[in-house]
Amino acid sequence: MTGRQHNHQGQFAVPFFDLSASAGGDTQIDLASETAQDPDNQWVFPRQWLAKLGRRQTDALQMISIIGDSMVPLLEHDDTVMLDCSQTRPSPPGIFILDDGIGLVAKRTEIIPSTTPQMLRISSENSAYSSYERRIDEVHIIGRVVWFARRL
């Protein structure tokens, strides 16, 4: 389930998945689980707002929470992120939600040029965490982070 037209004209709903992307430890992901796909658990946005984000389509948008501190100061524990699941190739580089073989993580991800097999550099914003590399075929990229919300 991904973003869709809401009952009110001029609005769209983005499903909030009841799982978290780790910005530190690891979390396993099951996007097919009934808990993750609760149709009543969604955020509603004005369609005009979507245009300001540079997005025209809503069908590939999803929301999840961030846990941990590896992406501080950019993303903090309990932030909610919107990801575009149509963007699964890190070119250009950016912040992605991915399953790196250990668990679901939010990380800065980029393709390392001139590598065979093709490799990804996966890094945190927080310098207390080391960057690491994975073969692109070892990683399942869920989507690019395009927006976030934070409690004050």
Go through each PLM region and give its residues.
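Short, positionally conserved secondary-structure boundary motifs
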Residues: M1-H77, A149-R151
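Acidic/glycine-rich C-terminal interaction modules and beta/coil loop segments
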Residues: L50-L152
